[in-house]
Amino acid sequence: MAATKRKRRGGLAVQAKKLKRDAKDGKLPAKANDVSEEAAEEEKDRIPGPVCKGKWKNKERILIFSSRGINFRTRHLMQDLRMLMPHSKADTKMDRKDKLFVINEVCEMKNCNKCIYFEAKKKQDLYMWLSNSPHGPSAKFLVQNIHTLAELKMTGNCLKGSRPLLSFDPAFDELPHYALLKELLIQIFSTPRYHPKSQPFVDHVFTFTILDNRIWFRNFQIIEEDAALVEIGPRFVLNLIKIFQGSFGGPTLYENPHYQSPNMHRRVIRSITAAKYREKQQVKDVQKLRKKEPKTILPHDPTADVFVTPAEEKPVEIQWVKPEPKVDLKARKKRIYKRQRKMKQKMSSGNAK
């Protein structure tokens, strides 16, 4: 029995050696050839996955969230930004009582190094913080003229998760505070290459334009045929307030001299309307005083009647006869109509007999 086992083992070893020799010589057995052909056919039918020739190195993660008290338009804008930025993360609303320094701890827990924070005040004013957590810098903006994707309904469209191009106004390179904001916007809004949630396509462009001391944001689709631009949305305008050295605080690097707070703006509007009302009341009071004043009687000017010619005096006629009464044409027509009607009735009754 032992001898037979040894022989079998030896036979198996010999067969394995033969297979190895055939593989080296390029001659596979018939079964191996069939397996390779089946694998080749399966590979032909298989749909190739997305092409990724590189490694994800830029690990930028953006935390996008807000404070309590925002309205529906701000919430929709926040959702649109999350949709356009696949490298973003969401979090629950922050309480108003918490200080802004707590956001740095939230970013650390969420493993994010950039933050977009929407701060609502008085249920009508919206502020946006762009911050590099935890070391800074950070910038505070007043958000104006918000138009969301659902509100605009533009004809443009882009692939969800695709990477955008960033287009900046040449004015960003002229002043140092705009150059700092440009770098901050590049790091926040640019989707990292080879990000797992991103698509390997570039089919839309974010434009940042400086006009009237404000930054105007637009999102356009790039059409493949003629490279034309069609707007997608959303839209908003950023009015810079301050740039801080730290994240959500610290020494002030720049303060916008052209900025006017919403409270001040509303106060100016109220003062203008109040001034108009006061002016109307003053005009009414002056008119009342003029009416109450006694009228000054001017002395008669004899030269005023120089060119007045007196009318000829007509003789007085006394009418002794009573004037004839005026003929009432309407009553006369009615009488004639009644007479004609009676005649017709008589004629019709005579014919019937």
Curated annotation (Swiss-Prot):
Gene3D superfamilies: Probable brix-domain ribosomal biogenesis protein
Subcellular location: Nucleus, Nucleolus
Ranges for domain Brix: 60-249
Keyword annotations: Acetylation, Isopeptide bond, Nucleus, Phosphoprotein, Ribosome biogenesis, Ubl conjugation
Basic residues bias spans: 1-10
Chief site of localization: nucleus
Keyword Phosphoprotein: yes
Post-translational modification N6-acetyllysine, affected residues: 276
SMART domains (alphabetical): Brix
Cross-link (Glycyl lysine isopeptide (Lys-Gly) (interchain with G-Cter in SUMO2)): 160, 314, 322
Cellular component GO terms, alphabetical: chromosome; nucleolus
UniProt-listed Pfam families: Brix
Disulfide bonds: none
Any one Gene Ontology BP term: ribosomal large subunit assembly
GO molecular function per UniProt: RNA binding; rRNA binding
Residue numbers carrying Phosphoserine: 261
Region (Disordered): 1-46
Family per record: Belongs to the BRX1 family.
Record function comment: Required for biogenesis of the 60S ribosomal subunit.
Protein name (record): Ribosome biogenesis protein BRX1 homolog
Species assigned in the record: Bos taurus (Bovine)
